[in-house]
UniProtKB/Swiss-Prot annotation:
Organism: Saccharopolyspora erythraea (strain ATCC 11635 / DSM 40517 / JCM 4748 / NBRC 13426 / NCIMB 8594 / NRRL 2338)
Pathway(s) served: Amino-acid biosynthesis; L-histidine biosynthesis; L-histidine from 5-phospho-alpha-D-ribose 1-diphosphate: step 4/9
Chain coiled-coil ranges: none
Lineage: Bacteria, Bacillati, Actinomycetota, Actinomycetes, Pseudonocardiales
Alphabetic keyword roster: Amino-acid biosynthesis, Cytoplasm, Histidine biosynthesis, Isomerase
Protein name from the UniProt record: 1-(5-phosphoribosyl)-5-[(5-phosphoribosylamino)methylideneamino] imidazole-4-carboxamide isomerase
Length: 243
């Protein structure tokens, strides 16, 4: 089983940034998104995970900039952020990206989400942003600020609709460099036949090696963000470790 790494480029106000736990106002800027994405391409990435944070938080869009980034990359792009109706989905797919991630829309408009995962197949993945609470495994919606229901109920519904891929984030881990929630990922993999991509918390090459051991269980890859930008390891080191 191969294990794919997707270095992240999160874009806010035209700049590549990183957030802590997805919270608006915690951005650290890393400069030009195209330069960031090209750097990952040069380092050997086969995929880039590109996020429009302004669209995700409902405060505008960087779509033209992101379309330009996609056009100038040779690697495959997974595009995320603010895709919640036919117009935004079609605009995202028109950038030439390989696939898009639905977030909030899959929770707040389930009929629409069920239709598009069936219609677009591999070109649509669903992001499941999980907050583990005393009430159980809850999904976080709309830029992680509202409750989106029970993880297992939503997963069963999307599976029944034919969803082809899930991107799973433990919100408490994202941007914290505290290590991924391996138990959560293992449980999600056990409950769906669709491939799963991990997101959030990766702090070291060892974390990625641990995740890659779940490839046989259905964990297809991991998004890597802050650890790369913080210099904890290079993408080349990470790719070598999981090959």
């Amino acid at each position: 089983m191969s294990f794919t790494l997707l270095p992240a480029v999160d874009v806010a106000d035209g700049q590549a940034v990183r957030l802590v736990q997805g919270a608006a106002g915690t951005e650290t800027s890393y400069g030009d998104p195209l330069e960031a994405a090209l750097a990952w391409q040069r380092a050997g990435a086969e995929w880039v995970h590109l996020v429009d944070l302004d669209a995700a938080f409902g405060r505008g869009s960087n779509r033209e900039l992101l379309a330009d980034v996609v056009a100038k990359l040779d690697v495959r792009v997974e595009l995320s952020g603010g895709i919640r109706d036919d117009a935004s989905l079609e605009a995202a797919l028109a950038t030439g990206c390989e696939r898009v991630n639905l977030g909030t829309a899959a929770l707040e408009n389930p009929e629409w989400a069920d239709r598009v995962v069936a219609e677009y197949g591999d070109r649509v993945a669903v992001g499941l942003d999980v907050r583990i609470t005393e009430q159980g495994h809850r999904l976080a919606a709309r830029g992680w600020t509202t409750d989106g229901g029970d993880l297992w109920e939503v997963l069963a519904r999307l599976d029944a609709a034919g969803c082809r891929r899930y991107v799973v984030t433990d919100v408490s881990k994202d941007g914290t460099l505290q290590g991924p929630n391996v138990a959560l990922l293992r449980e999600v993999c056990s409950r769906t036949d669709a491939p799963v991509i991990a997101s959030g918390g990766v702090s070291s090459v060892d974390d990625l090696v641990e995740l890659s051991r779940l490839a046989g269980d259905g964990l297809e890859g991991s998004i890597v963000g802050k650890a790369l930008y913080a210099g904890n390891f290079t993408l080349e080191e990470a790719l070598a470790a999981v090959r």
